């Protein structure tokens, strides 16, 4: 599995060219993309500037000598490469298994070309088998948890050890065990309208390419060619 993740990440790095501002994703597959960018800077003299999606990726990028800038100092990003936890046939996805969904969506939004790197196990017919992360403010989080519980969403707080995980943005994450999300766009809008929800892990209609690594090799799926 790690070999497939590395293959996807290295393939995505081939889309990066000199002078780009690039979004550096978070997670076990995006990790290999960031590593390959670091290698290309060192060995090929690649000239890029990165925008990171988590404190973990920031630390990795700094260790590799990748020049970084703040999302607040730019107006657009040429290319962002990130992982995904599930991708359906309509190119909607669930992200946030690494608890970085808020920063990931902020970086994805001004991106000209948004690429996901996944292994073939992440391709699904329907989203929802992977628990949907919902980032919520700490104030009122328990009340919101009960709202989700009454709605039948089977919520659970994301934990780190015996304490609730706190995201880079100082929020909690409530994971929803939905089983199957029949209409991701509609459910995303519902969460968007829920007071106390900062962001959710449904990335609907955002991705341009999905690079899939499988036993047979690498496949590049183009969202704009889907029917």
Curated annotation (Swiss-Prot):
What this chain does, per the record?
Answer: Catalyzes the reversible conversion of ribose-5-phosphate to ribulose 5-phosphate.
Please give the name of this protein. Ribose-5-phosphate isomerase A
According to UniProt, the reaction catalysed is: aldehydo-D-ribose 5-phosphate = D-ribulose 5-phosphate
A Pfam family matched by this chain, by name? Answer: Rib_5-P_isom_A
SUPFAM superfamilies assigned:
D-ribose-5-phosphate isomerase (RpiA), lid domain, NagB/RpiA/CoA transferase-like
Annotated source species = Streptococcus equi subsp. zooepidemicus (strain MGCS10565)
Against InterPro entries, the record matches this protein to:
NagB/RpiA_transferase-like, Ribose-5P_isomerase, Ribose5P_isomerase_typA_subgr, Ribose5P_isomerase_type_A
Active site residues according to the UniProt entry: 104
Looking at the record's lineage, which domain of life comes first? Bacteria
Report the family membership.
Belongs to the ribose 5-phosphate isomerase family.
Q: What is its EC number?
A: 5.3.1.6
Catalytic EC class: isomerase
Q: Which residues bind substrate?
A: 26-29, 82-85, 95-98, 122
Q: Which UniProt keywords apply?
A: Isomerase
GO molecular function per UniProt: ribose-5-phosphate isomerase activity
Biological process terms in GO annotation: pentose-phosphate shunt, non-oxidative branch
- Which ranges form a coiled coil? none
Q: How does it assemble?
A: Homodimer.
Protein's pathway: Carbohydrate degradation; pentose phosphate pathway; D-ribose 5-phosphate from D-ribulose 5-phosphate (non-oxidative stage): step 1/1
